Amino acid sequence: MARITVEDCLDHVDNRFELVIVGTKRARQLAVQGKTPMVPEENDKPTVIALREIEEGFIDASILDEKDEPQDTLIMGDADHSLDLGMHNSPEA
């Protein structure tokens, strides 16, 4: 795999500071939210995959306008659902 350079990525974002923010957000989407990579993974870490996506023009600063998916929603939703079904743990009297 060829090296990813900042200069190649800057063709798709305004400056290196925005590159860091865009790359970070996309890497989190890949690692934490389970988003599907737009480039072959090739055994790369999420940060490298994010930079490759930026370099190839699949990801740009518009990603910053997307709302993040809350991580606690699923956990709380499962807890509420189990309470509704009477599946909560209560001591027997």
Swiss-Prot record:
EC primary class: transferase
Assigned GO CC terms: DNA-directed RNA polymerase complex
Keyword Methyltransferase on entry: no
InterPro entries hit by this protein: DNA-dir_RNA_pol_omega (IPR003716), Pol_omega/Rpo6/RPB6 (IPR006110), RPB6/omega-like_sf (IPR036161)
Keyword line: DNA-directed RNA polymerase, Nucleotidyltransferase, Transcription, Transferase
Example of a GO MF term: DNA-directed RNA polymerase activity
Listed EC numbers: 2.7.7.6
Domain of life of the organism encoding this protein: Bacteria
GO biological process, one term: DNA-templated transcription
Reactions catalysed according to its record: RNA(n) + a ribonucleoside 5'-triphosphate = RNA(n+1) + diphosphate
A Pfam family annotated for this UniProt entry: RNA_pol_Rpb6
Similarity annotation: Belongs to the RNA polymerase subunit omega family.
Subunit structure, as described in the record: The RNAP catalytic core consists of 2 alpha, 1 beta, 1 beta' and 1 omega subunit. When a sigma factor is associated with the core the holoenzyme is formed, which can initiate transcription.
NCBIfam families in alphabetical order: rpoZ
Stated role: Promotes RNA polymerase assembly. Latches the N- and C-terminal regions of the beta' subunit thereby facilitating its interaction with the beta and alpha subunits.
UniProt protein name: DNA-directed RNA polymerase subunit omega
Organism in which the protein naturally occurs: Teredinibacter turnerae (strain ATCC 39867 / T7901)
